[in-house]
Amino acid sequence: MKGLKKKTTTYRLPKAKKHLVREESGLNVYPSTQDRELILQKKQTLAISKLYELKFGNYFDDILKISLPYLKKQFSDAELRELFDLLKSYHANSTRECVDYFGKVYCELVKKQYQMRTSPHYDTELCNFIGDKNSQIKIIWGDCYQVLKRLKSESIHLMVTSPPYYNAREYSKWENLNDYFLDMKEVITECYRVLDNHRVFVFNVGDIYDNDRLVTRSVWGKRRIPLGAYFIRLFEEVGFTFIDDFIWDKGEVQTQRHKHTNTPYPFYQYPINCYEHILIFHKHRLDKTRYPCPICGCLKVNDNTQSEIGLQSWECDNENCFVRSKSNRGKRFSLKTNITQRHQAEEYKISETLIRKWRKDIVNFPPVIKINSKGKNILGHTAPFPEDIPEVAVLNYTYPGEVVLDPFAGSFTTAIVASKYNRIGIGIELNKVLFRDNVIRILKKETSQIDLYSGYKKYAEYDLLHFTKTHRQKIMEVTG
């Protein structure tokens, strides 16, 4: 009828069929999971291709032109993006700055790869505590083996320590000498992992006269135990290279033990130990990763040979390198020489006084006086070592800003000395009840000038003593 609206019928398809109609009509095709992955892969490939075409307008372009094939083999796409982003954000004023910065970020990315392979479950909070720049002295209370296991691989630049002597002190009790060395080997194995490659461990230990308890517990089982020799063997088993042994001459013997004044006859007399070993070990983990030439910054290098056990060296194969020999040979270098030769400037010079003092391998300086006139132990430690040892270690084997660790910290002498020379000093100590009061008193006294002039907080504490398998209670105390 005229004026009436014609009724229309709407047919609604089920949702699945509606999609099917759309696909068949070509209006909206939904890609499969496999197709979506291919699309994403193409986008990433396109992004990486554009990344390779990026121009910096400086010497980075020359380095990347030669080094790109090697970079593709070494890094993932994500790592390459990180590398390019770092280069893009850096404003270099010279070719030398380009070479140095490229080498720096390249080495950092390679180290990050190694750390993820060897310490994927490191303790993020603990590592952040160590990396916090608000304090130069880090006090960590806990079992050193457990603490070391939570650190990133190759994150420490120097280690200096004196271990708890086998049953020579009231706080160090083992069933026998074998148990002692089993514990020490566990700790030193973790130290090897945590110490940076081509770096140094300075280890102070003295030989003792005691019973190893392997045959008898009787007093007649006592003998001279050459701990220094045993530790050298242990370090080498773990992977360290033994370099040197300084003999610390402690001067006149103060003790009256074993004097046998009432029996001045043959076979009753023997000398008292008045020396200790200061053992020097290098870590040379063989690393065949290709490293850039320190002269031109390029990765076009040839595998040369091992210049030392565990130390890989390279020869630059870039014909346009700035330095070539008369026979047209490229620069020969290693990761170790890249570290050492980059720091040959006036501010890194070691004083003539220190060089002369440690020129001979027998060094004389007195032990720490820990008992005052009232017979009280003013340091709270039965075997503190003098500042001379960490001082020579810090100045000979680190640069300003680097990290120094003492896994058996005691009175934290190493950490204090490291901070005096503008290094980050870290100490790990198990006996908080025994040492803390005296340690804090010493730190407040020793670090007062540091606080006044540098703006750093005196020290920071991190407590891992309450760690258990099911629950970890961590207490962070920052004292300012």
What does each model-identified segment do?
Residues 2-118, 124-437, 475-480:
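Core catalytic lobe of class I
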